[in-house]
Amino acid sequence: MLLEVNDLSISYGKGNPVVHGVSFSVDKGKILAIIGESGSGKTTVLRAVGHILPRQGQVTGGHILFEGKESETKTIREKTSFIFQDSGAMLNPIRTIGTEFSEYLAAHGITGGEAEDCMTNLLSQVRLPDPAGILKSYPFELSGGMRQRVGIAMAMAIHPELILADEPTSALDVTNQAVVVREMMDVCARADTAIIVVTHNMALASYMADTILVMKDGNAVEYGSAEKVIYHPKDPYTKLLLAAVPDPGGVLS
C-alpha cells in the first residue's frame, strides 16, 4: 500500500482536535476522494498527508505511513505533487509559463534540452494546444481551465507517486471541469500515480474515485469503494449528500 493513514487526529493550537481518528489508504494507480462540506476537516487531512499544515496545526494522534514507513517531510516532498484550487494563483503573473516551468524543473535537476522536451511533452499530454505558444504565454493570457492543466502538467513533471489535489475543479466552468477531471484520471492510469482529491462535490467524487471517504465535523462517517458509498450508503449524512445528485454515476459521462 502506498499511503496508509491510521487513526489520525489533528489540532490547531491548544484547542480541541479538528480531526478525530480518521483512517484510510490509497495505492498506486488509484484515486481516493475525500468529500464533505466546508469545515469538515477534509483539507486539513490533505495538508497533514502533504506535511503542509499551518504552523499552529499539529498531528496529535495516529500515524501516516508512506510505502510502509512513517511519513517524513523529505520523502513526501520528493515523491508528491500538489494541485490546488487555482493553479494560476501559484504562478508569477509577470513571468511566462515557460520561465516558471523551467525553474520548477531545474529545482528537481532537469535542465537544458531535457527540460525543453519535458515541458513540451507534458503540455501535450494534458491536451493543451500549441505547447510552444503556451510556454511563451503569461498566466493571465490563459483561461482557468488551461492554467489548471498547466498545473497538472507541472505536477506530473517529477513523476510523483502521489498527487494531492485540493478542490481542483471548483473554480472552473462545467466544460473545463470535465477536461481537468479526465486529465487527472488519465495521469492516474498512465503513470500508475495515486491521487487524493478533496472536494465538496459528490457527483465529481463518484465519477473519478475508486474509493470515497465522507467527512463531517472532523470525523469519517463513511468509507469504502465508490460503488458501495454511492449505491449502498449507510450514514444519514452520506445519504443527504447523495440526495442532491439525482444520478451521480452519470455525471460527466
Please give the residue ranges for each predicted region.
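The feature captures the beta-strand-to-loop junction immediately N-terminal to the Walker
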Residues: 35-37
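ABC ATPase NBD coupling module
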Residues: 58, 69-81, 99, 107, ...
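Q-loop/switch helix immediately C-terminal to the Walker
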Residues: 86, 95-106
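Conserved ABC ATPase signature
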Residues: 137-142, 146
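A short, proline-enriched helix->beta-strand linker immediately N-terminal to the Walker B motif
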Residues: 157-161
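A short, surface-exposed alpha-helical micro-motif characterized by mixed small hydrophobic
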Residues: 205-207
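ABC ATPase "signature
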Residues: 220-224
